[in-house]
């Protein structure tokens, strides 16, 4: 049966706590000067114990006191004021998460996560509160892929087992969490003592800074607000006190220092319970509400891990073990060898090749002199004062054999090591003297079982994969927009020039002996400009390519008798291109979410239009009579080239005044017009060459003209899921959309040319703007 602790000293505490914790701890607070000049406290007594476990062992609910944290952050009492804007009626979770989000050390992605996902924010705040108290030090990380020499990995199943594995990581490592909390308390000048906090007006400070101050002055806080032998750190460590009573006491302290006026009435009217009177309070009832004492069995029942959490913890432990076994530790660089003395060189020179090298024969230079006294290597000199000076004979350059790679007799093959070759030999500590050139003669090849070992690269995390994918798509998007802007200016400049004058100028500028089959040629003479004189970035070639593609699609579609062979399966080709595009990304892991493309949205609109047309055709009792037209009715005037409209005139002045310049960075984000790369509308000359404007069209019943679809600006919409109006279109995507539309028109319109639903489907994508306003087909 749980007992409620009395207002006085708890006598039952001596029976339930170890003997060494029955004494009242020393409450001395020292100070030390930090490197930055600030004064920090050194808590010399009653210091909190950090969570410490072996690497890979999970932190279970009892270790982090999950029930206490849950009750603190799930309390919905709206009695707090948010710092610094002063918004009232906030609960504790709101003001604590807001303080974390306002920290200068919080990234933009994490800040958005804290503000949008309340449950993920609470999970992170639970760990931050333990770091805030000092229960977790900065040697913990919570992701098995992380490796550091002074870090240990521990999963937290109660917080991580039920989260999305592909989501942005919700728990940062402990050093990063500590940095976020320090930023929340140090970005702005905050009161750093209890007296300074009391002198401030509401809102006095944020809860992160308040908890740091309370932990720093824990002995004073324990003396003022707790009955002995309880102290401030019992709130997060003492499992034999009920989680509910500890959470109430913690929130009582938060409200007292953040919201109260420190009067007797405020202590009695605390929303988390009236304060209690006791010693050291100055006559005020400022002791926290009494605690509920639990037995060991009752304490264990408060924090029970579920089966799924236990399985998750074991899974992560094994994963961590596998990662540590697969990755070798970072090798230490060998010490730089000392210069070989002469006496050691002479000793090694006398050895036969292949002889095992023992340790140094001479421990010092004096031993070498004594050994050389019996040989001819000792040279004596007479000083001017008559004394005799002895020294060893200096060897000749050829004696060192630095240039020669071998001595007389067979010797093992020398193993050369370079920095580029990340061999295990270079990674392992070198034996003494291994850097000497002569010692290297005796280095044999490494054993076979060491040759294949090399450090494996770490796999990228889901967040790193998403960032890399986003970066690639962003680069492609910007390059496509700049390319489209350049093509727009170049096309406007090309259209303002008379074709005969343009091609005549290009032909005159051809060098003598120009051959289009030469490797250095820039293309067919007279069609493409000389890149040394006029750079068009491939706009002209892209234009002719679009004409050829459109012509080939027209001929393939009009080949009803399959005279040119079997018809191409364009749908299959599009699927293969899409599959190749996805494989080119070369990413491991699943793509987070599916983003609809511009072609799929356009296809949905076309399907809706076709359904409406079918419904209209079914409702119509008699087919609409089509007005016959003859070749005479289609006058040459209508098929001739129209005068330049206002848009071309504007483009003319733009091209004439400014000329073509490489688009700047600011131009990269300008809107792209409909006549960019990939527009394949044919002029009347090309249509006459293809048979679309000749008199043989009179045999085909005329078709009404449908309003053309507006030019859709769409690049590959896998970039951030933008709208169709915010993206660019490539030539391949417009080809896919047009092929799909025209292939479907073959099925619905070619066999029923006079049907009301089949009118005007042939060249709907080739008719544009001013011609549609007049009700007459015209071609730019």
Swiss-Prot record:
Report the SS bond pairs: none
Basic residues bias: start-end ranges: 600-613
Q: What domain of life is recorded for the organism?
A: Eukaryota
Keyword Transcription regulation assigned to the entry: answer is yes
- What subcellular locations does the record give? Nucleus
Give the main localization category: nucleus
* Entry's Gene Ontology cellular component terms: Ino80 complex
* InterPro entries for this protein: Ies1
Composition-biased stretches, type Acidic residues, lie in 676-686, 723-751
Keywords, A to Z? Answer: Nucleus, Transcription, Transcription regulation
Annotated region (Disordered) at 1-25, 563-780
Q: List, as start-end ranges, the regions of compositional bias called Low complexity.
A: 614-635
Composition-biased stretches (Basic and acidic residues): 563-584
Role this protein plays: Probably involved in transcription regulation via its interaction with the INO80 complex, a chromatin-remodeling complex.
Q: How does it assemble?
A: Component of the chromatin-remodeling INO80 complex.
Question: What's the protein name?
Answer: Ino eighty subunit 1
State the species of origin: Emericella nidulans (strain FGSC A4 / ATCC 38163 / CBS 112.46 / NRRL 194 / M139) (Aspergillus nidulans)
